[in-house]
């Protein structure tokens, strides 16, 4: 499950699929994808990955591990339309929502932060202080190319 349909989110959907993951859906809050048309075709359409526009995650399910998310469509103001709720089973939630480290969820989870980078503090395996919770990509620090994010996550 991926939130964000800019080029990085689209390319990560393809990369994760090529690595053996089943990407169930890419959700985008906006009424359009921020990615290039060719990336939508080559990264989603060619792999049968659905893109849901005007859609957001309203709930994350699971205790020790993520077990799924509840999605909902949003209205013109970006507020969830509760009558459109849909559960999506998944064991991973990838946030691809911009080039500035997005750490609101990281901080709320109690993950220690690295003062120098403004991102999550991790060990050599990219595991945070919470056992089983790993961080990579722009949640650690800004990357210039999605290839570097993929390399870091490997």
Segments (PLM) and residue ranges:
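Residues forming the flavin
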Residues: 1-154
């Amino acid at each position: 499950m991926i939130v964000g349909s800019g080029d990085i989110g689209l390319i990560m959907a393809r990369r994760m699929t090529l690595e053996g993951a089943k990407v169930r859906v890419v959700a985008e809050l906006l009424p359009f994808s921020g990615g290039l048309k060719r990336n939508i075709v080559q990264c989603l359409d060619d792999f049968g990955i659905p893109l849901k526009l005007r859609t957001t995650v309203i709930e994350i399910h699971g205790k020790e591990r993520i077990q799924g998310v509840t999605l909902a469509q949003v209205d013109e103001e970006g507020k969830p339309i509760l009558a459109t709720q849909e559960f999506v089973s998944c064991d991973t939630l990838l946030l691809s929502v911009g080039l500035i480290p997005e750490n609101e969820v990281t901080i709320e989870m109690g993950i220690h932060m690295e003062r120098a980078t403004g991102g999550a503090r991790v060990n050599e395996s990219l595991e945070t202080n919470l056992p089983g919770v790993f961080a990579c990509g722009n949640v650690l620090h800004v990357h210039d190319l999605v290839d570097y994010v993929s390399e870091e996550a490997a």
